């Protein structure tokens, strides 16, 4: 008996692609002083969360990473969270 042959199977599940939270008319501006916004994109271990999880576009992910690194350097965000 062959799997996939025949008709009555379920439709494959497709997850809808999330849109970038920083694109759009009322999107927040990426700023290194906005610790509350930046901390949403840092894991509990202190690492920058990848864009495939946060659905941030490549350009905005680079801006976000730069802002997080700048905030860490200035002491607004910790490098490591214990």
UniProtKB/Swiss-Prot annotation:
GO CC aspect terms: cytosolic small ribosomal subunit
InterPro entries: Ribosomal_bS18, Ribosomal_bS18_CS, Ribosomal_bS18_sf
Keywords from the UniProt entry: Ribonucleoprotein, Ribosomal protein, RNA-binding, rRNA-binding
Gene Ontology terms describing biological process: translation
Regions crossing the membrane: none
One Pfam assignment: Ribosomal_S18
GO molecular function, one term: small ribosomal subunit rRNA binding
Subunit comment: Part of the 30S ribosomal subunit. Forms a tight heterodimer with protein bS6.
Function noted in UniProt: Binds as a heterodimer with protein bS6 to the central domain of the 16S rRNA, where it helps stabilize the platform of the 30S subunit.
Family affiliation: Belongs to the bacterial ribosomal protein bS18 family.
Protein name: Small ribosomal subunit protein bS18
């Amino acid at each position: 008996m062959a799997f996939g042959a025949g008709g009555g199977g379920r439709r494959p599940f497709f997850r809808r692609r999330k849109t970038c939270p920083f694109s759009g008319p009322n999107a927040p501006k990426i700023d290194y002083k906005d610790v509350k916004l930046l901390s949403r994109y840092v894991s509990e271990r202190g690492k920058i969360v990848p864009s495939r999880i946060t659905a941030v576009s490549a350009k905005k992910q680079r801006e976000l990473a730069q802002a997080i690194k700048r905030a860490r350097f200035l002491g607004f965000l910790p490098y490591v969270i214990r």
